Amino acid sequence: MNKLRTALAATAAAALGLAALAAAPAQAAAQPTFLSAAQMPASSTPWTATRVFTGVPENGGALCAPYKIPAQNSRYREFATELDTNGVQITTVARTEADAVKLVDTLRKALAGCGALLEQQNPGLHAVSAYHGKIAVEEGAWVYSLDTADPQIGNTDIHLFSVGRDGRTVTFVRWGQMGDLKDAPVAAFRTTAKTAVNKLW
């Protein structure tokens, strides 16, 4: 009987060890959390959100910062309403915190200079980038806008952006629709940007 109990105890211990090993990869695979559709700025029609995809969106991933966010260790979710309002969140985990700081700087410079660059690339287009301040959350989040008008086809578009960081994790959020800056929900977007960083971990 003692031998049987010893054997059962050994088997149970081995099973617990295997369970611990099996749990380890799950813990290591923890990923940053994304915004939900309801956490985007309020719109006249409900927001919907895609599932979270691996990598970055097509065509370089981010308006005003194409190919700036590496596809490796990145994931994204897209948002849309029944009208023309849309958005995206791209989150990447950098190798080191120093790399994350560099990425934030790169994205901020790209957003700040986006209007001038678009005007150079598209003669006749009027584009203005503006900075809307820093949000106090984790290591910070910074908000920008891009207001564009194309007289040739008579349309105007407004986009809001945020770049936030929590340790090695950087998250980029964009909101956009037809219209001008006066039509944009800047205050509500700041809340969205803060939530995006708070939800990461």
Where are these regions (language model features)?
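A short acidic-to-branched-hydrophobic micro-motif
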Residues: Y76-R108
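Short Gly/Thr-rich strand-loop-strand
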Residues: P46-G60, K109-T156, K199
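Short, surface-exposed beta-strand/loop micro-motifs that present aromatic residues
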Residues: R75-A80, I158-R165
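Short, surface-exposed coil-to-beta transition loops
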Residues: N86-V88, I153-L160
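N-terminal "mature-domain start" segment
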Residues: A26-Y76, T191
